Amino acid sequence: TPLWSLMQDLMM
């Protein structure tokens, strides 16, 4: 599972 996806969602 791509963690960056979640991180970017939170950053955005």
Swiss-Prot record:
* E.C. designation(s): 3.5.4.4
UniProt lists the family membership as follows: Belongs to the metallo-dependent hydrolases superfamily. Adenosine and AMP deaminases family.
Activity versus pH: the note is: Optimum pH is 6.5.
One Gene Ontology MF term: adenosine deaminase activity
Role description: Catalyzes the hydrolytic deamination of adenosine and 2-deoxyadenosine. Plays an important role in purine metabolism and in adenosine homeostasis. Modulates signaling by extracellular adenosine, and so contributes indirectly to cellular signaling events.
Would you tell me the protein name for this molecule?
Adenosine deaminase 2
Choose any GO biological process term that the UniProt entry carries and state it: nucleotide metabolic process
What post-translational modification does the entry describe?
N-glycosylated.
* Native source species: Gallus gallus (Chicken)
Report the activity regulation comment: Inhibited by adenosine deaminase inhibitor 2-DCF, but not by adenosine deaminase 1 inhibitor EHNA.
**CC cofactor:** Zn(2+)
Per UniProt, the cofactor note for this protein states: Binds 1 zinc ion per subunit.
The protein's UniProt keywords, in alphabetical order, are: Glycoprotein, Hydrolase, Nucleotide metabolism
- Catalytic reaction(s) noted: adenosine + H2O + H(+) = inosine + NH4(+)
Q: How does it assemble?
A: Homodimer.
The parts of the chain that form a coiled coil are: none
